[in-house]
Amino acid sequence: MGRESRHYRKRSASRGRSGSRSRSRSPSDKRSKRGDDRRSRSRDRDRRRERSRSRDKRRSRSRDRKRLRRSRSRERDRSRERRRSRSRDRRRSRSRSRGRRSRSSSPGSKTKKTENRSRSKEKAEGGDSSKEKKKDKDDKEDEKEKDAGNFDQNKLEEEMRKRKERVEKWREEQRKKAMENIGELKKEIEEMKQGKKWSLEDDDDDEDDPAEAEKEGTEMEDEELDPLDAYMEEVKEEVKKFNMRSVKGGAGNEKKSGPTVTKVVTVVTTKKAVVDADKKKGELMENDQDAMEYSSEEEEVDLQTALTGYQTKQRKLLEPVDHGKIEYEPFRKNFYVEVPELAKMSQEEVNVFRLEMEGITVKGKGCPKPIKSWVQCGISMKILNSLKKHGYEKPTPIQTQAIPAIMSGRDLIGIAKTGSGKTIAFLLPMFRHIMDQRSLEEGEGPIAVIMTPTRELALQITKECKKFSKTLGLRVVCVYGGTGISEQIAELKRGAEIIVCTPGRMIDMLAANSGRVTNLRRVTYVVLDEADRMFDMGFEPQVMRIVDNVRPDRQTVMFSATFPRAMEALARRILSKPIEVQVGGRSVVCSDVEQQVIVIEEEKKFLKLLELLGHYQESGSVIIFVDKQEHADGLLKDLMRASYPCMSLHGGIDQYDRDSIINDFKNGTCKLLVATSVAARGLDVKHLILVVNYSCPNHYEDYVHRAGRTGRAGNKGYAYTFITEDQARYAGDIIKALELSGTAVPPDLEKLWSDFKDQQKAEGKIIKKSSGFSGKGFKFDETEQALANERKKLQKAALGLQDSDDEDAAVDIDEQIESMFNSKKRVKDMAAPGTSSVPAPTAGNAEKLEIAKRLALRINAQKNLGIESQVDVMQQATNAILRGGTILAPTVSAKTIAEQLAEKINAKLNYVPLEKQEEERQEGGQSESFKRYEEELEINDFPQTARWKVTSKEALQRISEYSEAAITIRGTYFPPGKEPKEGERKIYLAIESANELAVQKAKAEITRLIKEELIRLQNSYQPTNKGRYKVL
C-alpha cells in the first residue's frame, strides 16, 4: 500500500504544477520530501512486521489445531473456523486490490512526466526509484510466501477431507462386520433395545448457525457417537456372561458358538476409555487380539492341550522307523581287491606277519589278509598324496588288518591301544565308501555318521577328517553339545556327507524342525569310536535310537582301546557277522610308557608332585589327573601359589573355555594341565612327556587311557600313579595293568594289595575287581513307566493330595507305607543255656538272700499261694473234662490279675524284675527259655532314594541304638513287574529283639525315615540315578 499511495501523490502534484515553473526547488520543499520518505519507510517496516507476526500466528494456530482438535469443544472449533474464513477473505481481497493497483501503475507513466525538470531533481528521483525497486522486490517475496502458505493450507484441508472419508469408510465396514457377527445375540439385543434406547438428548451442544453446521458436517462426524459401539459398550457384561455359558455348554455347543463369541469379544474387550458420567460418548475401537479375555476354564483347556501336544511330540521322537515301508536305493560295500603280492602269501606266512605286527588276533570267518603298504588297500591317488603330506609313512598294526576288513564291506570290532591309529583305520574306508555313491541333493542327510562319547574326541576326529576331505570335495560337520545349535543347524542344512557327533546332540538335530534339518535315510556307514565308554556313560538308548533309524543293511564299525566282555554282547546286537580284530592284547599300556606307582600318604602328595614337575616339566607338557571337579580346582590353586602356570579342564567348564584350554595346551601356550578323566580319551598332544595320576584311577580301563596320553606315535613317556593306603582296593587293577604291560610291580604295592586281601578274607568278604563304569541311561520301557507312576502315587500320598481319578492317593500315608511293608510278625520261644548272665552272688550277700527266700516261702504258705494253686486254669478245665466231671466257673485271684498286668507293663518297658532273675538264678543248671520277637518289612517297592535312606550303615546303626533291636538287610532287589523265583525273596528288613517294644520302636523309626524321603521327593524327584552333582 505504501508504494501505490506514494505514486498517487506524485502524479497529483505534477498535474497542479505550472509548465513554466523553474527547475530549482526551495530548501523547505526538499526537507518536506525527505520527511515524507522517512515516514513512508517506517510505515512499510511496520506493515512488514505485522505481516510476519500474523503469518507466525497463523502457523502456530494451525499446529495447535492439529494437536488439540479432538480435545477442544465443538463451539470453539466452529468459532475458530469462522475467524479463519474471514481472515482468508480479507487476505484474498487485499491481494486482488493490490494486483489491480500494481497493474495500473505501469512503467510507461513515468515517461509522461514533464521534461522541463532540473537535472538535480532527476538525480533525486533516480535515487528514489532504486529504493522503490528494492521495496518492490521485498513485496514480491512476501506475496510468494503468502501464496505458499495458502497452498499449504489448501493441501492440509484436502488431506483432512481424505482422512475423514477413510475413517467413515472404515467405520462402515466395522459396523457391517459387527452386525454380521452378532446374529445369535439378536434376540437379547432386541429385548434390551426395547427397554433402553439410545438418544442424543444429553448432548448439550447447541447449533448456533444451521448453515455452518451443514458445512461442517464432515468434521462433526469424526466426533459424533456411534450408537452400535455405545450399545455394545453397555451390554459388555451380558456378552461376557453369554461367553461363559457357551464355554460351559459342552463340546457340541462350543463348536457352534465358539467363533462367533470370539469375534464379539474382540470388538468389545478393548482398552477401557474413561467415560464421562454426563456424556456417554462413543470411543474409536480397534481390533486388539492381545486383549482378548478368557475364562479360567478356557485357559486350563489350552494348557492341557499344549501339554498333551508336547508329550505327544516327545513320544514321537521315540517311535522307531519302519524300514519295510521305505524303499532305499542300493549301494556297494565291497571295494577291496586283493593284490597278487598278498594273494601269494600262505596262511603260515600270514600268521607270522600278524605275530610280528604286535600279535594281531582275528576272530570271524572270511577275514582278508593284512596289507603291508598304503597302495595295497585300494585308495585313490588324492588320498595317497594326503597321507604322504601329513607324514603317514606306513600302516600301523591295527590299520594293516582293519582297513582291508572294512573295505570288504564287513562289520568290524577293532580293539587296539591308544595312539595306534584307529582313526585312520575307519576314515580311509569311509572316504572310498562315500566317493562310490552319488552326490547329495538338497534336503538329503549324510552318508557317514561317526559317534563319539566326548566333545573333545569329536573335535579331534573332525580335524583329522578335514585333512582329507578338502582334496576330495567332501563336507564335514561336527555336531556336539555345549555350543549354540543354530550354527550347526545352518551347516547341516547346507548339506554334509560326513557328520561327527555326540549321541545326545545328534538326536536333537534329528528332531529339530520336525526332522527337516537332517535325516538318516542316506546313511550307509556308521562308526562308533570309543564304543565301550559310550555305552558305559549311559549313551546306550541314544545310540540305539540312532542306529535303529539307519537302514538295516548298513555297514557298522566299532573301535575302542578297551572292550570288556559285557560290552561284546551288546555290540553284537547292532553288528552283522562282525570280524573282531585285536592288537596287542586286551587293554594294555603302550610299551613306550615307563610306569611308576608310588604308595604315599595324602599329605605328601603335593610335595612329591612338585618334585616330579621340577624334573620333567622342562622336557615337555604334563597332565595331572584327579577324580573330581572340586579337586581339580583346588589343585589348580595350589599349583598357582607354587608359581606353576597351569589350567584346569573338567566337565563343569563351558564348552568355549574347554576348547580354548585344549588348544592352548596343544599349542604349547600352557604346558601344565589339571584334568579329570574327561581328558583321558581322545586327547592327542605332541610333546606330552609326563602323566601324573594324582588321584588313583578306580578301574583298569581308566588307568590304561590315562597312561595312554603319553608315549604316543613312538615317543617316550612317563606315567606316575599316587596311591594311598585307603585306596588299597584299587591296587589290584594297577598290578594287573603293570603285569600285562611287562612292567615290574613295586614291592610296597604288592604288600598293600596282599594286606587288603587278608583283611577282606578276615571279614568274610569276597574281593571283586572293578570292571569299569556300570552306568546306563533310560530304557523307555514299561518297567520305567510303572516305577515312575508308583513314585508319583507315593508322592501324592505323602503330601495328602487327593485326586478324583486316583483312589489310592486318598489313603493315609502311614497306611500306604504299612501296606507296602507287607510286614510279617513272628514270636519264637528260644532256649538259652543254663549259665545266667546275672553275676553270681558274693559271700556277703548269700546269707541275706537265704533269709529273704525263707520269708517269701512263709508268706506264700500263710496266704495259700503255693505252687499247686498257680496251676493254669485251662489245665484244670481239661482235667475235669477227662475225669467226666463238670466245669466250674474258674476263680481268678486278685494277685493273678495283678501279676498278669505287671508282666504286660514290664514287657513294654523291657524291664525284668529282680525277683524273677533270682528265681531263674536259683534254678541252677536248669535251662531257661525266652521269647524272641521278629518282624519283616519289605522295602523292595519303595523308591531307590528311600531304600538308600533306611539301608545305609549310619541309619541302621542309629535305629539299632535307639530301639535296642537288631536290624539286618535280606533278600534281593527285583524291579517292578518282575517276580522272584522260588526260594528267592524281595529285599526286606528283618527286625529282631527280645521284647516287642523294641521291635515297634524300630519299625516306627523306619517308617518315619521313609515318609520324610517320600515328601522330599516331591520337589527333588528325578528319574535318573543320583550322582555327585545336581543340575540347578
UniProtKB/Swiss-Prot annotation:
Instruction: Give the location in the cell.
Output: Nucleus speckle; Nucleus, Cajal body
Q: Which GO terms describe its biological process?
A: mRNA splicing, via spliceosome; U2-type prespliceosome assembly
Q: Where is the lipid attached (N-myristoyl glycine)?
A: 2
Helicase C-terminal domain ranges (all copies): 592-753
Composition-biased stretches, type Acidic residues, lie in 201-211
Q: Which Pfam families match?
A: DEAD (PF00270), Helicase_C (PF00271), KH_12 (PF23469)
Residue span of motif Q motif: 372-400
Query: Coiled-coil intervals in this record?
Result: 152-197
- The UniProt record lists the Glycyl lysine isopeptide (Lys-Gly) (interchain with G-Cter in SUMO2) crosslink at 186, 325, 779, 908, 916
From start to end residue, where is composition biased (Basic and acidic residues)?
26-49, 112-200
Q: Note the InterPro entries from the entry.
A: DEAD/DEAH_box_helicase_dom, Helicase_ATP-bd, Helicase_C-like, P-loop_NTPase, PRP5/DDX46/KHDC4_KH, RNA-helicase_DEAD-box_CS, RNA_helicase_DEAD_Q_motif
Catalyzed reactions: ATP + H2O = ADP + phosphate + H(+)
Q: Which PROSITE patterns match?
A: DEAD_ATP_HELICASE, HELICASE_ATP_BIND_1, HELICASE_CTER, Q_MOTIF
Annotated ATP binding sites: 416-423
Domain Helicase ATP-binding, by residue range, is 403-581
Q: Which GO terms describe its cellular component?
A: Cajal body; fibrillar center; nuclear speck; U2-type spliceosomal complex
Q: What's the EC number here?
A: 3.6.4.13
- Composition bias (Basic residues) maps to 1-24, 50-73, 81-103
Q: Which residues carry this modification: Phosphotyrosine?
A: 294
Q: Which domain of life is it from?
A: Eukaryota
Q: Where is this region: Disordered?
A: 1-227
Concerning CDD domains, the annotation shows: DEADc_DDX46 (cd17953), KH-I_DDX46 (cd22473), SF2_C_DEAD (cd18787)
Residues that the record marks as modified (Phosphoserine) are 199, 295-296, 346, 804, 929
Classification via PANTHER family: ATP-DEPENDENT RNA HELICASE DBP3
Function field: Component of the 17S U2 SnRNP complex of the spliceosome, a large ribonucleoprotein complex that removes introns from transcribed pre-mRNAs. The 17S U2 SnRNP complex (1) directly participates in early spliceosome assembly and (2) mediates recognition of the intron branch site during pre-mRNA splicing by promoting the selection of the pre-mRNA branch-site adenosine, the nucleophile for the first step of splicing. Within the 17S U2 SnRNP complex, DDX46 plays essential roles during assembly of pre-spliceosome and proofreading of the branch site.
Q: What is this protein called?
A: Probable ATP-dependent RNA helicase DDX46
- Which organism encodes this protein? Mus musculus
